[in-house]
Amino acid sequence: MKRYYLFDEHDELLLYHDGKEYTLPRLDLPDEASFHAFSADEVVGRVSNGKFRSSLPAFPEGHDLFAMPLRATYRLLSPADYQRAGKAWELLYWSEQTAYCGRCGTAMQWATAISRRCPQCDGEIWPQLNTAIIVLVHKGDEALLVKAKTFHRNFFGLVAGFVETGESLEECVEREVFEETSLRITNIRYFGSQPWPYPLGLMIGFHADYVSGDIRFADGELADGGFFRPDDLPTNADGSPAIPGTESMARRLINDWMEG
C-alpha cells in the first residue's frame, strides 16, 4: 500500500486528535495507484471553527482534525511520525518546484514515488537536498552563540550556512565561521545530522575549537553574538534560556556541550 499524508492550502499538516494524543491521518492506496500530491481540501471539508470534517471513511468519526505548521508538530507527534510528515512535505514542495522539465519545458510526470520523468526527452530527476552545516565553536568552557537577523524569535543559535559547489563539509564550516564572525577555528569534528524539511534540506552538525580573532559581524547576517558559559546563557524576559527549540540540530549541539 502507498501511504499519503495531507497538507492544506496553507501548507499546514493535517493532524488527528482523539482527546489524548495527536497522530497523522493518512490515505492508504494500492501500490498500482498513480501517485498524486493530495491536499487536505480534496478529501476533507473545512468547518467554521477552523477544524476539518471528514468526507472519507478512512477518517474515523468522532476524531477532531486540525491543521498545523509542520514545525509546530515536533512536540506533538512521535519522532517517527514527525519524520514521515517531513518527508511528505519535502516531496510535495519538490513536486511543485519541478512541474516542468528544465531542459525542454514539457510538463513532468511521476516515474516513481520519489522521481519524475519528462515524457518528451525522457530525463528523470530526483529531489536535490540543500546541504547545510551548523557548528558549535568552543573557547575553553565557553561556546559561541549568535543571533541571526532572520530569526523570527528572540534567541541565540549557532553559526550555520549552506555548502557551496566544490567545497567539503569541513571547508564550509571554516568558511562560514570566518565570514560571519571573523574568527579562525580548528579541530572540526562531526557530531550528527538530521533531515531539515524547511523546505528540502539536510543539516549536518559539527563541533570546532576557537583559534584566534575578535568577533566582527562582517557579512551582515548576524545581529549579535558572543561566547557564553553554560551557567550564563542569554535569557528571555521570563528568565528561560534564549536558545533554539529541542527539535533542532542547534539545540542538540548545545545540549551536548552543556552535558559534556
Each language-model region and where it sits:
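Acidic, metal-coordinating catalytic segment for phosphate/diphosphate chemistry
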Residues: 84-134
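Nudix hydrolase/Nudix homology domain
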Residues: 1-98, 152-156, 218-260
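Surface-exposed, charge/polar-rich loops and edge strands
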Residues: 167
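Active-site-adjacent beta-strand/loop module that shapes the phosphate/pyrophosphate-binding cleft
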Residues: 194-219
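Hydrophobic alpha-helical positions that pack around
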Residues: 159, 173, 177
